[in-house]
Amino acid sequence: MSAAEKKPASKAPAGKAPRDTMKSADKKRGKNRKETYSSYIYKVLKQVHPDTGISNQAMRILNSFVNDIFERIATEASKLAAYNKKSTISSREIQTAVRLILPGELAKHAVTEGTKSVTKYSSSAQ
């Protein structure tokens, strides 16, 4: 065979697996998991109203609400730590952020419950 009669080189790079086998490897990874507060919301609902259920849409709305409040508090606490030239967010920054974000009575109750929870956690950790 002369140089003019040789077959053109294949377009696929040597050493790489064909695409269809790579797709089957992706299938083995499993589902992408979404982390939500659904189980915790459900537990609180059952503590407050044992005979009441909740729809999927209502659960999605509450989950979105919790994520939103969490993000607001974390952002505000981060700003407070930066103002005070601290690299760590402590319970004090969280408490101040809650007071700044939540209105009136709601902030007072949130701070009280938060303090109670931190105290309970600290005493059980020892």
UniProtKB/Swiss-Prot annotation:
Modification after translation, per record = Monoubiquitinated by the rhp6/ubc2-bre1 complex to form H2BK123ub1. H2BK123ub1 gives a specific tag for epigenetic transcriptional activation and is also prerequisite for H3K4me and H3K79me formation. H2BK123ub1 also modulates the formation of double-strand breaks during meiosis and is a prerequisite for DNA-damage checkpoint activation.
Q: Where is this cross-link: Glycyl lysine isopeptide (Lys-Gly) (interchain with G-Cter in SUMO)?
A: 6-7
Give the disulfide map: none
* CC terms in the record's Gene Ontology section: nucleosome; nucleus; site of double-strand break
Q: Which Pfam families match?
A: Histone (PF00125)
Q: Subunit notes for this chain?
A: The nucleosome is a histone octamer containing two molecules each of H2A, H2B, H3 and H4 assembled in one H3-H4 heterotetramer and two H2A-H2B heterodimers. The octamer wraps approximately 147 bp of DNA. Interacts with rik1.
Its recorded name reads Histone H2B-alpha
Species: Schizosaccharomyces pombe (strain 972 / ATCC 24843)
Please name the gene that encodes this protein.
htb1
